[in-house]
Amino acid sequence: MTNLFVRSGISFVDRSEVLTHIGNEMLAKGVVHDTWPQALIAREAEFPTGIMLEQHAIAIPHCEAIHAKSSAIYLLRPTNKVHFQQADDDNDVAVSLVIALIVENPQQQLKLLRCLFGKLQQPDIVETLITLPETQLKEYFTKYVLDSDE
């Protein structure tokens, strides 16, 4: 069972601040080892995770499974868009949704990434993830992204 955490309405200066926040939050939740926050920052620097979709940009930061204690996903919707470097070039994209992945094994990570990429190609799902009230976000993400077989 994957832990799912959601948070909206936080302002960040830049992606470094976002990644630091994610690292601190996941440490506080007890789902990562103390090596995870720095590993997340290092991996994002080497392998950027910003993705421009049809209507919105997102980022899916993650790092090696060795740094995880248990599986989790952290959905973070910053107050203002935050620039992340795109995964496929040197340009930045203004991200309105961050989906941080904490996984315990590489096969699980690959499966989860494939699932996410498939669902995030649907503009209506992305729009809903960005605009839905925070109180409904966990249920929606679980039902329409994680548990959906479509």
UniProtKB/Swiss-Prot annotation:
Keywords: Cytoplasm, Galactitol metabolism, Kinase, Phosphoprotein, Phosphotransferase system, Sugar transport, Transferase, Transport. Pfam families: PTS_EIIA_2. It is found in: Cytoplasm. The EIIA domain is phosphorylated by phospho-HPr on a histidyl residue. Then, it transfers the phosphoryl group to the EIIB domain. The active site is at residue 62. This is PTS system galactitol-specific EIIA component. NCBIfam families: PRK09665.1. GO terms for molecular function: kinase activity; protein kinase activator activity; protein-phosphocysteine-galactitol-phosphotransferase system transporter activity. Forms a complex with one each of subunit of GatA, GatB and 2 subunits of GatC. GO terms for cellular component: cytosol; transmembrane transporter complex. The phosphoenolpyruvate-dependent sugar phosphotransferase system (PTS), a major carbohydrate active transport system, catalyzes the phosphorylation of incoming sugar substrates concomitant with their translocation across the cell membrane. The enzyme II complex composed of GatA, GatB and GatC is involved in galactitol transport. It can also use D-glucitol. It comes from the Bacteria. The modification Phosphohistidine is found at residue 62. Induction: Constitutively expressed. Residues 1-144 form the PTS EIIA type-2 domain. GO terms for biological process: galactitol metabolic process; galactitol transmembrane transport; phosphoenolpyruvate-dependent sugar phosphotransferase system. Signal peptide: none annotated.
